[in-house]
Structures are given as structure tokens and as C-alpha cells.
Amino acid sequence: MRSGVIAQKLGMTRIYNDAGEHVPVTVLRLENCQVVAQRTVEKNGYTAVQLGVGFAKVKNTSQALRGHFAKASVEPKAKIAEFRVSPDNLLDIGTEITVEHFVPGQRVDVTGTSIGKGFAGVMKRHNFGGHRASHGNSITHRAHGSTGQCQDPGKVFKGKKMAGHMGQVRVTTQNIEVVSTDIERGLILVRGAVSGSKGSWILVRDAVKKPLPDNAPKPAGIRRLVKEKTEMVAPVTETSEVEGA
């Protein structure tokens, strides 16, 4: 089981496939996603990695989080989240995950917080059909109607579909297809809509109901830092001896 990533939702657009058909996609940006902490069986009883993403001002970061990020030798992050991983996919602190973590055609599970709609009636919240528009009906056109039985059981059962607060809940959409990735700009394009407003943080992880592609990188798609080692060689100058003065 690999780690997931934290991405930021930029919005929706559409792209065209090889057949000339347009595909609606949601654009997710992966920026500065690093491992800031580890969870091990010996110390915590389970195996996981804590990721941080984005940039946060030091003055807006609490003293506790400043010490947490300083211990990991990373910059303050705007968002942190934890992902369970298998022991063989545990990542070192400071490792940066890129969009190469996912491959086109892969299925992922996406988690976000839906847009809040406020107090909504049953026709909007639960897709009720409503009552008659006329023929004796008065002021109950959009009402929910009866909510229970009679003296027995003498109550309204829990979970009854009624008017109330709608939206602003954690929603996970499973088996979304990764259409493509943009390595240079750090973008992940997934098919269809994703819960959440523009600019919100989205959790993207491998689908639990679909197999992982064989070409998916393990333990993760990390940024390779190539350090060029140059040997400093002192210049050699040839000196000619002048005979005679």
C-alpha cells in the first residue's frame, strides 16, 4: 500500500482524447509535497507517513508546528495529512513526492469537503417530488409531508429524510481515472468532478477496489535530486627555464 498525496483543486476544464472526444477533467496541483513525519510499528503501533504541502508564512504558523517542521528540516506547510502505508513503502522524512506518483489510466480515490449549501429543503436535499401545485393544495407545495406513523411508535425514526443543513461534509469518490499528468507544472488531471471548492485541499490515493498498475512507481514517485560533483583541479602552468642571464 503506497502513500497518497495532498493536492489543491484549481478547477475544471476539458481536454480531447485521441478519438477527438472531449473529456471533462478536474485539475489538481501538487506543489512542494514532502514527508514531514513517520509513524512506525515500534513507536506508534502502525505504519504511516505524514505529508505536508504548500507554503505557509512563519508568522501564521503556531509555535508547536514551527518546531514540528524544524525537526523535519522542511519549510512550514499550509496543509498536513497522514496516509497509512505498508512497511516496504515507508518514505524518509524530507522526501518530496511529485505527480509522477500516478500514471495515466490509473484509478484513484479522491477525498474532499463538499461545498456548503446552507439550510435546504427536502426537494433540493433529498430530491423529493413535492406536492400538487393546485387542486386544493395550499402552502405545502414543497413540504416533506408526513414524518411518521401514529401513537405507535409515537416518534420520528432517526435518519428520516427531512430539511436541514446540506453540504460541507467529507466526501470520497472512488475509482476516478487519472487522464494525464503534467510533470513540469505539477498538475494531475482526473476525469469528472471532484468534491470541494476551488482552492480547497484534496486527498488523492490509490484506489482500494482496483489493482495498481504495474508501471506505477514504488514506493512512490519522488523527486530525484542530482548533485553534480565537480572536481576542482588546479591549473597547471608550464614554466620554461631561461638559461643564461
From Swiss-Prot:
Protein keywords: Methylation, Ribonucleoprotein, Ribosomal protein, RNA-binding, rRNA-binding
GO cellular component, one term: cytosolic large ribosomal subunit
Ligase keyword on record: no
Chain positions found as N5-methylglutamine: Q151
GO terms for MF: rRNA binding; structural constituent of ribosome
Post-translational modification: Methylated by PrmB.
rRNA-binding in keyword set: yes
Pfam family, one: Ribosomal_L3
Superkingdom of the source species: Bacteria
UniProt xrefs under PANTHER family: 50S RIBOSOMAL PROTEIN L3, LARGE RIBOSOMAL SUBUNIT PROTEIN UL3C
Record-linked HAMAP family: Ribosomal_uL3_B
Subunit structure: Part of the 50S ribosomal subunit. Forms a cluster with proteins L14 and L19.
Functional note: One of the primary rRNA binding proteins, it binds directly near the 3'-end of the 23S rRNA, where it nucleates assembly of the 50S subunit.
Protein's recorded name: Large ribosomal subunit protein uL3
Gene: rplC
